[in-house]
Amino acid sequence: MAEESKSKMTYRYLGNSGLKVSVLAIGTMLTNYYKKDVEAWMECANAAYEAGVNYFDTAEIYGMGDGDKMLGESIKKYGWKRDNLVISVKIFSSSPAPTHNFMSRKHIIEGTKESLKNLGLDYCDLVFSHRPDYQTPLEETVRAFSWLIDHGYAKYWCTSTWPPALISDAIGICEELGLHKPIADQCQYNMLSRNDVERDYMNTFESHKYGTTVWSPLAGGLLSGKYNDGNIPEDSRCGKSEAFKGMMWGPMMGDDIIEQRKKMFSGLKEIADELSCTQAELALAWVIVNKDVSTCIFGASKISQVDSNVKALEVAEKWTPEIEERINNLLKNEPEMPVHYRTFAPWPARRPTRVNYDFKAGVLEQ
């Protein structure tokens, strides 16, 4: 069963590198909200591994180190081969102490070492700047990440929610000084949040072949089908965590747009039913058919959720221009593109040129 599942996983190169990552990844962010569900998460992580997921994402701030430890325990418990894994850690903040925060050389290096200690590993494959830091000189930051690679603590470095101009500045400094360049950004991408991938990073993709490790493909569960009636289920993430509710519900399901959202959810459910899939599987497939997405990070607290996410690969194989158009008409949120000053007309929308209508599960996509 495990080998059959693995054969269905699709892999893509991460940005302008030779690193192959599964198009689906699992992360530890839920430890911020559900610390009691550690065992359940570990079982989910193993189910993901058995399904061919090779990318596992964590951060020093997730549970203030608990996310790292949970992933490390999973590697030991299930005997995963280290050279089969792509482990990513994110550095930005680990405690209130003044030296435990932001993108100084000191914290980047010491924070990475602490994450590796919590993971029980000698190195990570990817180390991320979890957020941009405008107070620390950019050269100091990029030198520190390059140092980690030179000294064997990481194989590549990446950014997370960095603005495109800052990414270009960082790459320019690296090229000038002969340092290792970042290869991907971890940004949000889902049906309700499209601007980063479909507009803002357009030139970054073209100029630098930058990759993405996108997060929140189901918009924190809002696209899962649980919220279709406009109410918050008690057993949902928003129902269990006020912090999570404040982060996701307010901005995306406010009183001024909730009726519009309910109508949209109803339309998505109709399409999902026609494709014999769940609404969550449809939403995830919508993300991964975009070739600008290198890998898509999901969270899970139940094995059934992992199984459903993997089934999104089958939904992606069924993708057609008609499905794409119907969904886009429901969403009504295609990013407003910048003006192309040779024509004084907006740039063409990017997503239509990047959707893969020949998605085949189990292949390596260029």
Which positions does each model-derived feature cover?
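Conserved, mostly hydrophobic/aromatic
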Residues: 14, 26, 56, 71, ...
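Glycine/proline-rich, positively charged
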Residues: 35, 50, 94-196, 200
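N-terminal binding-site loop/beta-alpha segment at the start of enzyme catalytic domains
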Residues: 1-86, 122, 150
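Glycine-rich beta-alpha junction loops
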Residues: 91, 163, 189-193, 216-227, ...
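Terminal-tail/helix-coil boundary detector
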Residues: 2-9, 207-208, 231-274, 289-293, ...
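Aromatic-lined glycan-binding groove of carbohydrate-active enzymes
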Residues: 196-244, 278
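Generic structural signal for well-ordered alpha-helices
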Residues: 11, 45, 68, 72-75, ...
